[in-house]
A protein has these predicted regions:
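Loop-centered beta-sheet repeat module
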Residues: 116-180
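Repeated scaffold domains used in trafficking and secretory/extracellular systems
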Residues: 41-46, 83-92, 149-151
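Blade-loop segments of beta-propeller domains
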Residues: 25-60, 82
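Conserved beta-strand positions in repeat-built beta-propeller and related beta-rich domains
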Residues: 7-11, 57-60, 99-102, 163-166
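Residue-level detector of Asp-centered blade-edge/turn motifs that repeat once per structural unit
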Residues: 2, 48-52, 91-94, 156-157
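Surface-exposed loop and turn segments in beta-propeller and other repeat-based domains
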Residues: 28-40, 79-83, 125-147, 181-187
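Asp-box/WD-like beta-propeller blade repeats and closely related beta-sheet repeat scaffolds
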Residues: 58-113, 126-140
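Beta-strand-rich domains and repeat architectures in extracellular enzymes and scaffolds
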Residues: 1-15
């Protein structure tokens, strides 16, 4: 945000640190790690809606998003839409978050895509599909071992978004008007 900075170490201790972006001073430490309905167990992604003074915590283990105010008070939660996991969670606009709906390594399929989800109830407002010829995943399997490198699929770019799909040879630009256009193309 312009005034607030949120930091976490992706779940190890459950701490979410709130800083004043201008001064760099710590404002508070929030920890809602636990097994209760208003707690997270593995806070993997956090995004801030500074206008509404809310933070959205994507709990990878329970596959839900919990919403807190900036003092750490629970406001609401909602589950992911299906068996997917959300990678890269960002504040998109007043009413939506943008994320990449991903599936476990051995279940990766053509249902994976970028989505806009409601900040109120988690419902999918829009699926954003990028074209590709053949489904390819960066997963290597050998005997019982599976290696899946971590990479990011969603990048903010001024007022637009850069969207990456490992099956595509193109990085796409998604604009606020809902249009998709090639940004970087492998030739």
């Amino acid at each position: 945000g312009k005034e607030i900075l949120l930091i976490t170490n992706q779940g190890n201790d459950g701490d979410i640190l709130v800083f004043d972006r201008k001064t760099g001073k710590g404002i508070r430490k929030i920890n809602r790690k636990g097994q209760g309905g208003e707690e997270y167990s593995y806070p993997y992604y956090i995004t801030l809606d500074e206008d509404k003074k809310e933070m959205f915590v994507a709990d990878y283990a329970t596959r839900k998003i919990l919403v807190y105010d900036l003092s750490g008070n629970f406001k609401r939660s909602f589950k992911y839409t299906d068996t997917s996991y959300y990678n890269d969670l960002f504040d998109y606009d007043r009413d939506h978050l943008i994320t990449y709906k991903n599936y476990p390594a051995l279940q990766e399929n053509d249902k994976a895509c970028h989505i806009l989800i409601s900040k109120q109830d988690g419902s999918v407002a829009r699926e954003i599909r990028t074209p590709f010829k053949e489904l390819e995943t960066p997963i290597v399997t050998k005997d019982e071992f599976i290696v899946s490198p971590e990479f990011h699929q969603t990048y903010p770019d001024h007022t637009d978004w850069l969207l990456v799909n490992t099956s595509s040879d193109t990085i796409y630009r998604y604009s606020a008007d809902g249009s998709i256009s090639p940004s970087v193309v492998r030739t």
